[in-house]
From Swiss-Prot:
Its cofactor is Mg(2+); Mn(2+). Mn(2+) 2 binds at residues 77, 261, 307. It catalyses: O-phospho-L-seryl-[protein] + H2O = L-seryl-[protein] + phosphate; O-phospho-L-threonyl-[protein] + H2O = L-threonyl-[protein] + phosphate. Residues 42-316 form the PPM-type phosphatase domain. Binds 2 magnesium or manganese ions per subunit. It comes from Arabidopsis thaliana. This is Probable protein phosphatase 2C 61. Keywords: Hydrolase, Magnesium, Manganese, Metal-binding, Protein phosphatase. Mn(2+) 1 binds at residues 77-78. Belongs to the PP2C family.
Amino acid sequence: MGFCFCLSSGGSTDKSQIYEITDYGQENAVLYSDHHVVPQNLGSVSSLAGGKGLNQDAAILHLGYGTEEGALCGVFDGHGPRGAFVSKNVRNQLPSILLGHMNNHSVTRDWKLICETSCLEMDKRILKVKKIHDCSASGTTAVLAVKHGNQVMVANLGDSRAVMIGTSEDGETKVAQLTNDLKPSVPSEAERIRKRNGRVLALESEPHILRVWLPTENRPGLAMSRAFGDFLLKSYGVIATPQVSTHQITSSDQFLLLASDGVWDVLSNEEVATVVMKSASEAGAANEVAEAATNAWIQKFPTVKIDDISVVCLSLNKKHNPQPQI
C-alpha cells in the first residue's frame, strides 16, 4: 500500500502500488510513501506556479521506492502547448517503468542501460497518444534520482538540475552539482544537433539564449537539447537519452536536492545549499527554496514573468521514522 500526499490539496490514501502503473494524480507536487504514513523527517516537495499561467512543472518524492530505505526524486519542467500533459504523464509513468527494469537488472552495474531503456519506452508512450495529445512542439525536461543503498543514481534530460548538499570537515556548507545543464549552448550538444541538420541560433531579442530550430523553419526554438516529447526535433538532434551518473553517499552528505530551472536561473548552487541548511525542518526545505527563488526573480527580473518553480529535497542519512499525517 502507499500513502499519497498531494501538497496542493492535502492528503489522501492511494491504494495503487508503484509496481503497476501508479497514477500519482494531477497535482503538480506529490509526496508518496509505500508506508502507511508519510515520514515527515525524510524530505519535502514543492511546486509553485509562475506568472505565465498554468503551472507546467511536476515533481515527485517517492519514499520506500524499490526498498524500504529507498527513495525516488523527480522534477519535470514542461514546455509548449501540451507541456503540463507531458510533465505529469512522465512523472506518473516513468517511475514504474524504471522500477520494472531495475527488477530485471543489477541496479548499480546496469544503471545506464536501465535509464536509457526506460526513457526510450516513456518517449514512445508519449508519441503513441499523438492523435489525442499532439506533443510535436511540447515536451518536458526530467531530472531523476534514485537512492539505492548508499548510492544516489541520477538520470537527466534537459536543464533541470540535481545537487548534493552537506558539511565539509571544517563545518562549512558544501554543495556538489550532480548533473550538467543539457542545453544547445553545450558544444557537444550543439554538435550533435548540427550533425543532424538542426539549427542552433539565438534570437536577436535574447542573444544569450541558444535555441534549437528546424533546418528551414524558424520554429519551435527549443531552449534545451534533450527532452521527452518535442517530436518535431527528434530527427534533428534533440534526444530523449539521459545523461546518467552514480554517486556514493558519505557521512558528510546530508541532502539531495532537485529543482527546475526556475530555481537555477536566479539562485546559485551555493545559495540554494545555504537555504536548505538553514531550514527549520526537512518538511519545509523544498518550499523555502522555492520561495527564495520566487523572491530572487522579483528582485533580479522585476519586469519578467516568473518561471514555474519546483523543488524536491531528500534527507540522505536519516532512517525512516514515519509520523502520522495530521
